[in-house]
Amino acid sequence: MWRKTIQAILLLLTISAGSLKAQSFQEFTSLYKNTEDVKSGQFNFRFESLGFFQNNEYLGDFVKGYTLPGALFRPKLTYSPTDALYLEVGAHLIRYNGRDQLEKALPWFSARYRFSENFSVVTGNLDQNNLHGLPEQLWEPERMYTDRPEAGLQFLYSGTKLNAQTWISWEQFIQQDDPFQEHFTFGLTGDYRAYQNSALSVKLPVQILFYHQGGEINTAPEGGERPGVQTHANFSAGWEMAMNVGQKIKTINLNGYWFGYDAVTKDSNTLPFSKGHAYLLETSAQTRHSRISVSYWNAFQFIAPKGRLLYQSVSDSDPTFSQADRSIVSAKYFWQKEITKDARVAFHVETFIDIPSGDLSYSYGFYLLLNQDFLLKKF
């Protein structure tokens, strides 16, 4: 098994060497309009879409395999009275192939105001570009087309050395005597460019997430007890080192991350663990169109409520099963190409080996993204 895995990695490196700067899947799925693309006085019809076909073949006791075929659509009317103010109103639609009804059909409203060249605020539906800079261990990328779009309040800062953002996403709102809890997520992420020259750059990323379920004005569901407050936290810090190689392979990256988990409300915690940690070591190579990476994941009692299920110490498919120690080796290949300025296509394949059990899981997907503006009127 190990020999075949190494041979597959070498084959992917050979393929990718012949192939714009490669992006991560999180960057590829960015739909929200960048500030530098906003033009004052334009009233546009904007159409955002992401067609996806993702197949996850998972073995083991933690998560069952499944397939996600479908498309995400966001038709919008946008207006920018000035370069600093950008408004969107429209709809967020998700349809899975083989279903007659839309999986999600939600109204969309977003407003962004840029206080300065570096600092801006977003209200309503949030800017989820690059998934806030979160790694998949903390935030499952496919939530982009399975969950409701985030909505709340967000502040973003972009500088020459520091990029940071903080946000609160309100996922379930409650009124007096509602028989369910309010849900929201608070996040703070950033990366600091500690060193950079023509040959080497070093960034120091930090991520903090809090997930809360509670409320003071809700009541117990009919025939049941009032649920306790649940607050869970995840933390992450590390380094990302990129070496510019040139030639066919553009950069080689060496990354390391530490992750933490804490059940803040330990007295009412319903999960099997109240504290845990993990670390991730990753090396990758980037070519003009592709990225290949190999990583090692080691975790102890690690839980991330929004993270990719495969990495956790608790089972999603069997609520009674948990395993404190996890060790996973993974190899991933991601290819993407810009068709036009507003359209991109991508493909990825991933393999995961659970070291204790020897289970081999894999995932692959194909994606087509289109973000297009149609000018209706210039004021």
Regions found by a protein language model. Give the residues of each.
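Bacterial Sec-dependent N-terminal signal peptides
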Residues: 1-28, 155, 362-379
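Surface-exposed coil loops of outer-membrane beta-barrel proteins
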Residues: 120-191
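Surface-exposed extracellular loop regions of Gram-negative outer-membrane beta-barrel proteins
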Residues: 68-91, 156-167, 254-255
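Outer-membrane beta-barrel biogenesis signature
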Residues: 22-44, 127, 377-379
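Exposed, low-structure sequence patches enriched in small/polar residues
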Residues: 70, 108, 159-167, 179, ...
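Surface-exposed loop and membrane-interface regions of Gram-negative outer-membrane beta-barrel proteins
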Residues: 81, 85-116, 136-137, 307, ...
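Surface-exposed strand-loop-strand hairpins of Gram-negative outer-membrane beta-barrel proteins
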Residues: 50-72, 89-97
